[in-house]
Structures are given as structure tokens and as C-alpha cells.
Amino acid sequence: MALNVVILAAGKGTRMRSDLPKVLHPIAHKSMVQHVIDTAHKVGSDAIQLVYGYGADKLQASLGEQQLNWVLQAEQLGTGHAVAQASPHIADSDTVLILYGDVPLIQQSTLEALLAARPENGVAILTVNLGNPMGYGRIVRTPCEGQEQGKVVGIIEQKDATAEQLLINEINTGIMAVPGKQLKAWLSRLSNNNAQGEYYLTDIIAMAHADGVAIDTAQPQSAIEVEGANNRVQLAQLERAYQAREAEKLMLAGANLRDPSRIDIRGDVTVGMDVMIDINVIFEGKVTLGNNVTIGAGAILIDCEIADNAEIKPYSIIEGAKLGVAASAGPFARLRPGAELKQDAHIGNFVEVKKAVIGVGSKAGHLAYLGDAIIGDGVNIGAGTITCNYDGANKHLTVIEDNVFVGSDTQLVAPVTIGKGATLGAGSTITRDVGENELVITRVKQKHLTGWQRPVKIKK
């Protein structure tokens, strides 16, 4: 029995006031529909049917390389009509899980509970109880022996409900698990004879009851899981809810957040114990923080690994980089892809490192560019040092061996190797290899011109 997931993503989202299809609007730097697709994979989907309509070119540009079966809904005639477009791709033996591309916070655990609640050859509906159910379809039940809440007999939409039914506060989320054979039969019997003139997917529940099919329900841990976004205000509310949930996960895993409401998590963050994260930090991609790591205010960390006791000082950007034990970067440092700081290495303010290894205990405190370089242990890089790695066509390597002292304002024109223990005088331009323990100075001889007068500004 295969799990066949149908994701409804055909809507334009007029209230978003955007040329972008609604489901492509982002939560945590990832489209809403991508969140849903990822969760579908987590619950073990064997196939995913993506029902699309508006903005097909943009949807396919965003999602096209994934294993999806694209199902066109040329006209938006209701949720039942949307699911019916996927019928040719549903086997009789499938369990069909119906999800929505604009409901991005649905959790794996909730869907697993829904699937577990589905009776054999029956239907499971995800419902939630709301204090104010206005606008939602209501779950209609009748008394049944052995069922405290009663037996589900149907779902009635808001516009079609009686005054009595409007008092019901258990609402339909639209998410359900249905047997494939029966689903296809029920879809073929749908009618649009209702206030909206649409084919309601919810009508299949009354059909299931009439056919004697068992119906059960499950509920999410939080109602926010089943909230959709129809405008940018709701989108922002979902973003805040997502960030609050992710911040809570970090704190439960051992991180101290200076202010949990001022952190942005846009990927997968793994933390050790006693991690300290200051305000306005952004995480993107896959980020790993070891024990006792400190992240300063305003830092941005993208796809990086930070070892135990390391420190990222305020307003530093760390992307595709690794920091070893007790290494530090910043404030205002930039580590680009391929940068690696070994144990106790330090990169200070306004230093940029790209595709370079900084050895154990080595440091570049201020105003330097270190690109395409291998720097040994115990090296001091003076302020203003530049590895000149690009000749206009190709990149070249600079090698600085252990215990080298590089004076301020030094240019190292690659390819070049500086031997162990060498000293480079301030202001030097190094174009040839330097031997071990050599002192190299390439400055022009200093001149003293007595009696020299500064230019005087010409009055106009």
C-alpha cells in the first residue's frame, strides 16, 4: 500500500497583491509549498502529485528539479475538482494524503498521527477546535455509542451551514487521508450544487458515511500548524510562528537566546550545550554549533561548522566556513566559502578570508584579504595585508609556513611561498619565494627633502 500525497497549489492568491503564485511566497527563506513538500517526504511519501494552475512557469522554475508529478488544474473549480485532476495518478490500493501548498507549518508528527488514526479502508480527517470558527467548514457529528464526541457524518461549509451548525467549533482543516479506490469513486459523484458553485472535496465525507465507511479524526498539537496565508499579514504571522517554534527547539537543545523573538532561522541549526546567541542573528542552510559557542549580535551564519568554545563576534558573516576549537572571528569579519580557522586562530575586524586555511594560533587582526592561501601555525598577519591571488585570468596559491611574521601593508603576489620563521617588513611587495628565517624588505629607500613647500590652494 503506497502513500500518495496530493498537494493543492493551483491558486493565484489575489490578496497577496503579487505576480508570484501564492504558494511560492516564503516562510524562513523557503517557499510555503517547499515546506509542505519537505514534510511530505518526511512522512514517507511514495509519490507526490502537485496540482498547479496559476504561474506554472514560476512554479516549475522553483520546483522543477524535484521528484514531483505535475498535474494541471486549468480552471479553479474547487478543492474537489483539484483533487479529481490527480485521479489518473492514484492507484486503488493507495492511501491518499491531501495537503495544501499554502499551509506550510504542518508537522511530520501531526501527519503521522493522522495516518495512524485512519481506520482500515476508512477515512481520517484532521480537525481543530477554534474559539472563533467563522469562515471554516464545520465537522458534523451524530451521537454514537462508544464515541464520546459522536460519529462524523459530514462537513458543512460556512456558507451552506444552518444557524445550529454555525455553533459548532470543530472545524475542517482540509487535510485528510483517504483510500484511493473510494476517493476516485466519490470524486466522480461530486456536484457543484452549493452556494459557491464549486466542487467541494468536503462532500466526500458525507458520501463515505452513506457508504458505511469508517471515519475518524486527529488534531494537531497547535492550531497554527493548519493556518494558511492569504495575504501578507497572515504570511508575516506564520513567519513569526515558525521562528518562535524553531527558537524554542534551540533553547530546549541547550542554547541561550538573548531574545527569542529576535532571531531568524532559515535552515537546519544544530547546537551543543551552553551556546549563547545574541540578538538579530540569522542562520541559513545547515549550521552546526558545538558546545560553549558564542554568537554575537547581528552575525549571519550560512552553511558552516563552528567547533566547541569558538566565538563569532558581532556583525560577522560566516558562509561555507569552518571554525576550530576556540577559534574566533570578528567583529565585522567575513569568512567566505572554503575558509577554515584551525584551533585558537583569530580573524579580526574587516578581514576577509576566502578558500584559505588559517593555522593553529595564527591571527589576522585587522583590514586584510586572505584568499587562496594556506597559512601555517603561529603566523601573524599585519593590518593591510593582501594575498594577490588573481592575475586577471587565473587564481594562484599563497603558502605561508609556520611562525611567519607579516608586517602591515604587505602584498603577497601569488604564486608565492613564505618559509618557516620568515619576517616580511611592513610595506613590502613580495613577488618571489622567501626562505626560512629570512627577513625581506622591499620598500623604496626613504628620502628627506628639506625646504619643501606644500601646494597652496589657488584662490579664484
From Swiss-Prot:
Acetyl-CoA binds at A383, N389, Y390, S408, A426, R443. Mg(2+) binds at D102, N230. The active site is at H366 (proton acceptor). Residues 1-232 are annotated as: Pyrophosphorylase. UDP-N-acetyl-alpha-D-glucosamine binds at residues 8-11, 22, 73, 78-79, 100-102, 137, 157, 172, 230, 336, 354, 369, 380. Its main location: cytoplasm. Residues 254-460 are annotated as: N-acetyltransferase. In the N-terminal section; belongs to the N-acetylglucosamine-1-phosphate uridyltransferase family. This is Bifunctional protein GlmU. It comes from Shewanella baltica (strain OS155 / ATCC BAA-1091). The gene is glmU.
